[in-house]
Amino acid sequence: MLVMKAPSVRIDDVARLAGVSMITVSRTLRRPDLVKPATRDRVQRAVETLGYIPNSSASALASRRSGIVGVLVPTIGNSIFAETVRGVSDSLAGRNMQILLGDYGYSAERERSLLRALAGRQLEALIVVGLVREASDRALLASLAIPVVETWDLTRKPVDRAVGFSNRGAGSLAARHFLGAGRHSLAFGGGNDIRGRARAQGFTETARRGAASAVAVTRDVGTAVGSGRELLDEILRQQPDTDAIFFANDVLAVGALLELRDRGLAVPGRVAVMGLGDLELGRAYRPQLSTISVNAYKIGAPAGDIALARIDGVGAGPRVVDVGLELLLRETG
Amino acid sequence: MLVMKAPSVRIDDVARLAGVSMITVSRTLRRPDLVKPATRDRVQRAVETLGYIPNSSASALASRRSGIVGVLVPTIGNSIFAETVRGVSDSLAGRNMQILLGDYGYSAERERSLLRALAGRQLEALIVVGLVREASDRALLASLAIPVVETWDLTRKPVDRAVGFSNRGAGSLAARHFLGAGRHSLAFGGGNDIRGRARAQGFTETARRGAASAVAVTRDVGTAVGSGRELLDEILRQQPDTDAIFFANDVLAVGALLELRDRGLAVPGRVAVMGLGDLELGRAYRPQLSTISVNAYKIGAPAGDIALARIDGVGAGPRVVDVGLELLLRETG
DNA sequence: CTGAAAGCGCTTACAG
DNA sequence: CTGAAAGCGCTTACAG
């Protein structure tokens, strides 16, 4: 298909057809309330007749408003981060703002270069999954002077704003529950990343303070059912009498449930299992997975809302928003 | 934190410091090979000293190249589409091209408005999940005169290019396999969307041509394990002697496996089960799920490659790329 | 190998 | 309620 580059319609084409100035066309498109109805109608008709679509590069250059929010994620392949992006997307919908997506595939190097690439894009706000830790990156973001929302991890000193929950708190919550249920040989299984380690720490500290024994197995695992099987295997090897396990996410927990079933170990009779994330998978499994509810979508949506509020210059709000944690006790303990 | 809007560094600041013209700075940044090494070094040092980051809106306006590829998905919340986006992202990495993400939440209305919003953004290419069916939308995209890659669904008449597989072919492949394995009471379960219905059609046609009875249950289900349970229930209600079921995706199939286990129905003895998508979940389940391998990432990556090649004006290649289908026979039939 | 001039297509004050 | 002028910060030919 040989397509001739259509000579695109510009704002002065519309102005000429409508018999007004370019500025009136511009105004009709962005502040129609400031234009006399009759004029507005003529302009709108001209826009439709010509199929005029404003050039956003020109608009962004002149107005210093790109209508773009950057979102930086470790990987869009992990459903929890995808859900967070979806929350941001829904928050932005209706404002005609678009998302510029940066996926750095868990590579620190790609993260830095993406941050710099996004920095040149006149973003109106930036939302990142995780905290920005590098001093030079923080300085870069600060120099941009745009709203920045760090999500998932909480910190006392966000670059600008943060929305998330305490990973140590999640671990501690799970341990407290197990202790209260009379379990005494506890274990944690999860990824060997910053979030996993924080959950492990909160879990084991609380367990030991409660006079229970506790092991933590953190490994380079993704969000894979098969990894849950492996973690279970390692946990039982390290601490054979384990009677309660907290996994860093529901997928790992379901993997462990499958492995426990294959081994004929009763849940929760022999071992109690708890996940994190409240995924549909855990709800549909039998026995239904107990979990700590952390809703990825409900991190993304407020992050988007906060970014919008900051862009509008209203609702300063708190610097740090803790979305909190809820224990969802179901059948696995 | 009260941040003063940093007076941003512009290209002429760099030019002044380096003692060259703006144009030489510009050239150093995009075609360093055309600049004398000594000059280049001076410019690069000035860029670093000042922390200069080019304004991409101005660059896009002047060069008519935005460095942005649009990606339109029904929802980023479905992991298969997220994987496709990840494939596109990886394909674009290293070219300093960014993804503008449009998530329309399966709403035809939002899809149309997003398409129009993206149309104004000087995209260098557009990748969409699914086919663009509306004539007005197709006309809009054609008028943009940019590469367009439709993914997942195949068609003989793409707007520009298409990468995907035949949904009817997938259904037919599953049915042929079941027939060859001596099954005679077949069923399909899946979503009541365009892809689900096409898979159902291919499946039932082939089944009946093979003298097997076949029912197809298509419902408004997402990609949920619980939906797989429900579909199984409905299938057995409609056709109690069903001995082989093809599900539109692996998640539904695993849901059915859980339900079959709860009901004490042997797999594959009593019922054979096959999914589609080759998800890790199916591989980690026991018995391991047989599936038709369709790799979402491997649809996204070539889509990105094709877009890049078209942007570069090289490698015309075929208009339609069929990524093909592979039957992965494991333990469930 | 380097630069002066013109222009990309909008919007921002400001004036009336 | 509407418009003339200036400018946003780059890059594109073109010339030398």
Which residues does each predicted region cover?
Chain A
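Acidic/polar helix N-cap motif
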Residues: D13, R31, S107, S166-N167, ...
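Bacterial carbohydrate/catabolite-sensing allosteric modules
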Residues: M1-A6, T49, D90-R95, S143-E150, ...
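N-terminal helix-turn-helix DNA-binding module of bacterial transcription factors
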Residues: M1-G67
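Alpha-helical recognition/docking segments in bacterial nutrient-uptake
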Residues: M1-V9, R64-R176, G180, R237, ...
